[in-house]
């Protein structure tokens, strides 16, 4: 189908596609048009990676906008939100406006009301619905990207319930669900009352196989010689041959440590294939990476990148990941070793994909478990870049002939599993039942069950034990919510209490709220450590794991600081509870170290974490402490100012005396300390400061000093003709604090 044949979209869209080099639609895209995606029909598109799902979404959104409507694009990851924002920004030259929102859960997003396309994570959309964002009622089209992730036990229920709420608010809403190839696409379409495009078509061939011995064994029975040299491992041999052919490789492993170890080893292979220009460009990129943060993770990543390899996992900062992804797309980095999160939608195609580890540790199973077919196929789908590669190859690695047969059966020849709803788990139900009642979607038990009838769970288990199980979980959850004061019940009728409304607005798990309220009940003046440990033990915080030898250290710390901890310390004989308490204490001490201005690299080394982990814990703690502040104020529980101070300290990573300074835009934790040591102790001091002193404290960086002074409200922030104060400069040099590197808290 020629792009000019598509009706219902703005006249300029066909010209735009031609400028992008697109003259005709892929078969799945044409099938979507035939199914009415540009005429307002709901659609489930279950097609492989790189088969044009985004264009299907654009057809739906632009046709809705052309009819005077608004479109919402839901993504599973913040990184994907940024990527989609950049893609859709191309439409701004045609008069459309695009907004992205992934931040505060208390924000109603009123500023988005005049946007044509809104990009948001499912959690953010859920919070906007809870908080009554007025533009939600006016949506005409919603696109749910990576909708197969409703199968994820942590994030899936939020997407599932959010789609049910959006369809309840607007019964005529067009829903376009973009999915990987799954085993029950028809059931997904039934849930959403949608047309179905279910296709295995790809723009270039994907050859799936297993490497064993000295050859690749493909699913069609053919073999390709790929010898492993005496000093090599199979992964290195695959990467080496791919480089020789001018291609790039994604290597998927099962842990962060394995990702880093594999990247360091493969860097010895990739470096031999670099030319002089690539070496120079990679050297510059490595310096950018080192400037992101002063941690061992940053240094290790930069060392790998200089040699043409990289690792990618959640412990890396978002800046690290973006730099690596961009350089890989530009074919500068030749190999990325990643954990499976990279397979979840971020656009990083490669000539070859190697699934090195097809098992990973499962705490629930108590050991190593095989990955699902769906997850492995998602990784494999990254192989082959349309327009760049003649084909894509996805390879698993076998150590024996028996394992070769097993991998062919389990992954190469297998169809992906059906997607299954995880809504009926009690942690999900706690949050979503309270939100459903508090936001007015149900005012009785029967109305709740009626609302839940619009979910995927109801579609899958409408008859038999599943329906009975849903009612049991609902009743258990309602009992918990009533016992803890979040709802009132009168017969069948249900109403959220003031506390319930607050908890829903704050986007807290009710169990987190109950833990915080209980901890603050007898805490007149809580310390920062006590507050950090309190929020760290809530279900909304993924606390740090206890490593070998940690139990003794943190048991001693628990008894030493027991007076500060909020709530009753469990007995050591309560094995599970005591371990959880110690894990929360370890997390709290990391937050305390951060708020005490310990260097980021020291924190990373002490706790065995990366900059991305630190940022994640800091952001979560800031949110939970903000929620604790609101709960304490509304419930008259504890000294709100103490909670506020602990929140601001963890937000900026500073001691109490630096909170005011660190709040100035562009200052951050290290610059605040330098200014303070130079005698500038408050925002008011900075507003009236001698510019030469500020310039010296900020290491002579004129633009930085000018920006900081302007943010503080200085009357004349310009640095023309200003020289650094010699006494301050000499003092700073003696202190030896000029590391010249950025830090999580610098900006």
Curated annotation (Swiss-Prot):
An annotated GO BP: DNA repair
Positions contributing to ATP binding: 29, 47-54
Keywords: ATP-binding, DNA damage, DNA repair, DNA-binding, Helicase, Hydrolase, Isomerase, Nucleotide-binding
Gene3D superfamilies on file: 1.10.3380.30, 5' to 3' exonuclease, C-terminal subdomain (1.10.150.20), P-loop containing nucleotide triphosphate hydrolases (3.40.50.300)
Cysteine pairs bridged by disulfides in the record: none
Enzyme Commission designation: 5.6.2.4
Residue ranges constituting the Helicase C-terminal domain according to the UniProt record: 234-434
Sample GO molecular function, one term: 3'-5' DNA helicase activity
Segments passing through the bilayer: none
Pfam family membership, one: DEAD
Assembly behavior: Monomer.
Record-given protein name: ATP-dependent DNA helicase Hel308
Species of the source: Natronomonas pharaonis (strain ATCC 35678 / DSM 2160 / CIP 103997 / JCM 8858 / NBRC 14720 / NCIMB 2260 / Gabara)
């Amino acid at each position: 189908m020629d792009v000019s044949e598509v009706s219902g979209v703005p006249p300029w869209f066909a010209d735009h596609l031609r400028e992008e080099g697109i003259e005709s639609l892929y078969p799945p895209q044409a099938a979507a048009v035939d199914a009415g995606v540009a005429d307002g029909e709901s659609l489930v598109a279950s097609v492989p990676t790189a088969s044009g799902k985004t264009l299907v979404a654009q057809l739906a959104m632009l046709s809705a906008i052309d009819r005077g409507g608004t479109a919402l694009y839901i993504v599973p990851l913040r990184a994907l939100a940024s990527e989609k924002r950049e893609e859709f920004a191309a439409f701004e030259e045609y008069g459309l406006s695009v907004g992205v929102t992934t931040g505060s859960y208390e924000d109603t997003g009123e500023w988005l009301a005049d946007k044509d396309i809104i990009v948001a994570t499912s959690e953010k959309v859920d919070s906007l619905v809870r908080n009554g964002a007025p533009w939600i009622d006016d949506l005409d089209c919603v696109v749910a990207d990576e909708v197969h992730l409703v199968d994820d036990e942590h994030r899936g229920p939020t997407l599932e319930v959010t789609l049910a709420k959006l369809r309840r608010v607007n019964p005529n809403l067009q829903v376009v669900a973009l999915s990987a190839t799954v085993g029950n696409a028809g059931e997904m379409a039934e849930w959403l009352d949608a047309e179905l495009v279910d296709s295995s078509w790809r723009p270039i061939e994907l050859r799936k196989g297993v490497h064993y011995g000295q050859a690749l064994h493909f699913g069609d029975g053919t073999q390709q010689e790929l010898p492993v040299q005496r000093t090599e491992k199979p992964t290195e041999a695959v990467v080496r041959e791919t480089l020789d052919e001018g291609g790039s490789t994604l290597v998927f492993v099962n842990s962060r440590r394995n990702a880093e170890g594999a990247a360091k080893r493969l860097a010895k292979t990739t470096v031999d294939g670099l030319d002089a220009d690539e070496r120079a460009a990679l050297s510059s990129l490595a310096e950018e990476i080192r400037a992101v943060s002063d941690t061992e993770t940053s240094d290790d990543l930069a060392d790998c990148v200089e040699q043409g390899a990289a690792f990618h996992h959640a412990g890396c900062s978002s800046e690290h990941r973006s730099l690596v992804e961009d350089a890989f797309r530009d074919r500068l980095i030749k190999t990325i070793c990643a954990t499976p999160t990279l397979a979840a939608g971020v656009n990083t195609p490669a000539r070859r994909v190697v699934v090195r580890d097809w098992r990973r540790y499962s705490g629930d199973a108590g050991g190593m478990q095989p990955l699902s077919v769906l997850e492995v196929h998602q990784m494999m789908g990254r192989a082959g870049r349309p327009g760049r590669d003649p084909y894509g190859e996805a390879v698993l690695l076998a150590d024996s002939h028996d394992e070769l047969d097993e991998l062919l059966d389990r992954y190469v020849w297998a169809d992906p599993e059906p997607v299954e709803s995880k809504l009926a788990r009690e942690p999900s139900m706690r949050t979503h039942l309270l939100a459903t009642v508090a936001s007015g979607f149900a005012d009785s038990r029967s109305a709740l069950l009626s609302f839940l009838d619009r979910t995927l769970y109801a579609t899958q288990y409408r008859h038999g034990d599943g329906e009975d199980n849903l009612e049991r979980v609902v009743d258990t959850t309602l009992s918990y919510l009533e016992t803890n004061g979040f709802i009132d019940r009168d017969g069948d009728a249900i109403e959220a209490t003031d506390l319930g409304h607050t908890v829903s607005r704050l986007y807290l798990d009710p169990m987190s709220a109950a833990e915080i309220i209980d901890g603050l009940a007898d805490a007149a003046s809580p310390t920062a450590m006590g507050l950090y440990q309190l929020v760290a033990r809530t279900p909304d915080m993924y606390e740090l794991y206890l490593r070998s030898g940690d139990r003794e250290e943190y048991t001693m710390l628990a008894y030493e600081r027991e007076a500060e901890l909020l709530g009753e310390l469990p007995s050591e004989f309560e094995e599970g509870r005591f371990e959880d308490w110690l894990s929360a204490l370890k997390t709290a001490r990391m937050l305390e170290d951060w708020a005490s201005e310990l260097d980021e690299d020291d924190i990373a080394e002490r706790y065995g974490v990366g900059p991305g982990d630190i940022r994640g814990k800091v952001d979560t703690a800031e949110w939970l402490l903000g929620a604790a502040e609101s709960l304490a104020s509304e419930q008259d529980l504890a000294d709100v100012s103490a909670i506020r101070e602990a929140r601001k300290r963890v937000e900026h990573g500073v001691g109490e005396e630096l909170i005011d300074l660190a709040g100035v835009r562009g200052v951050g934790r290290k610059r605040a300390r330098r200014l303070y040591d130079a005698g500038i102790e408050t925002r008011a001091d900075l507003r009236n400061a001698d510019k030469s002193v500020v310039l010296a404290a900020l290491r002579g960086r004129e633009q930085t000093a000018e920006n900081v002074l302007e943010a503080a409200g200085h009357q004349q922030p310009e640095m023309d003709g200003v020289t650094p104060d010699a006494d301050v400069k000499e003092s700073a040099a003696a202190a030896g604090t000029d590391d010249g590197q950025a830090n999580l808290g610098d900006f």
